[in-house]
Design a protein with these regions (language model features):
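Glycine-rich phosphate/pyrophosphate-binding beta-alpha loops
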Residues: 61-63, 197-198, 251
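Alpha/beta catalytic cores of group-transfer enzymes, especially the acyltransferase/condensing modules
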Residues: 12-13, 100-242, 246-248
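A short, acidic, amphipathic alpha-helical segment used as a generic capping/interface helix at domain edges
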Residues: 249-266
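FabD-like malonyl-/acyl-CoA
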Residues: 2-140, 188, 268-297
């Protein structure tokens, strides 16, 4: 029995006009985006189509990606496609919570708009940096971060694949970690174009505000298992608030999450929402995995044909 997991895109996957074709062609997609606009108090479709500056600002990026992803999820559900498990990268975890039945969509929209604003305030653009480290053993990376942390905060932030780990933190400390990694033989280090050092201790203030906002939301039972970023384990309802609070300031354990899904029998991964970042990671983790992504009319039709 083939088991299928839906994976939901995270921040950085956004692009101008994402989801436009599907919005024009399918009522459920239009209804979902319009529903988000009502919650937000601004025209989300117009922002996604016409305002690239805002679309790349964390407080707008997060609801834009969430709404686009959930709209596509609802369309697939309408077509009879349902996952056996779900997960999402960072922000994508909120789309996964909606898909799993644990979080109401309108609550999710309001929540990620707050999350985006808190993250922006806690780590204003330019306040830190993130660097992807390729083809370097995890223990070497962790050791370099530990040594460099005499200069400030620097830790692994995203364990994307065994050969791609992102470190993040304060500029001086990250730069020192990069020097140490180069001395240790790391050849490929790529500075990332992100608005802040997410998933590090620099987001403590955002984490505290988010904790407060999360207590005001009512969560439901999971209709489908969700593998969480922070521990790479199936999330339990009574721990949702704790794990989402920690998720902003702790590393995302993506490749361990994929391994857990594979242990549970998942062989097919469908990436939902803008971009193909997660499909790329899964391919690096296991080149035998079956992959598809759905973000526009062409990819939807290709997926439905298979």
């Amino acid at each position: 029995m083939t088991k299928t997991a839906f994976l939901f895109a995270g921040q950085g996957a956004q692009y101008l006009g994402m989801g436009r074709e599907l919005y024009d062609q399918y009522a459920i997609v239009k209804e979902t985006i319009d529903q988000a606009s009502q919650v937000l108090g601004y025209d989300l479709r117009d922002l996604i189509d016409n305002d690239e500056t805002k679309l790349n600002q964390t407080r707008y990026t997060q609801p834009a990606i969430l709404a686009t992803s959930v709209a596509i999820y609802r369309l697939l559900k309408e077509k009879g496609c349902q996952p056996d498990m779900v997960a999402g990268l960072s922000l994508g975890e909120y789309s996964a919570l909606v898909a799993s039945g644990a979080l109401d969509f309108e609550d999710a929209v309001a929540l990620v708009a707050k999350r985006g604003a808190y993250m922006e305030e806690a780590a204003p653009a330019g306040s830190g940096k993130m660097v992807a480290v390729l083809n370097t053993p995890v223990e070497v990376i962790e050791q370099a971060c530990q040594e460099a942390s005499q200069l400030g905060v620097v830790t692994p932030a995203n364990y994307n694949t065994p050969s791609q780990i992102v470190i993040g933190g304060e500029v001086a400390a990250v730069d020192r970690a990069v020097e140490l990694l180069q001395e240790a033989g790391a050849k490929r280090l790529i500075p990332l174009n992100v608005s802040g050092p997410f998933h590090t201790a620099l987001l403590e203030a955002a984490s505290q505000k988010l904790a407060q906002a999360l207590t005001e939301v009512e969560f439901s039972d999971f209709a489908c298992p969700l593998v969480g970023n922070t521990e790479a384990k199936v999330m339990e309802k009574e721990r949702i608030v704790e794990l989402l609070t920690r998720q902003v300031k702790e590393p995302v354990r993506f490749y361990e999450s994929i391994a857990l899904m594979q242990e549970a029998g998942v062989t097919r991964f469908i990436e939902i929402g803008p971009g193909k970042v997660l499909s790329g990671f899964v391919k690096k983790i296991d080149k035998t995995a079956q992959l598809a992504n759905v973000e526009d009319q062409a990819s939807l039709l290709a997926f439905l044909e298979n």
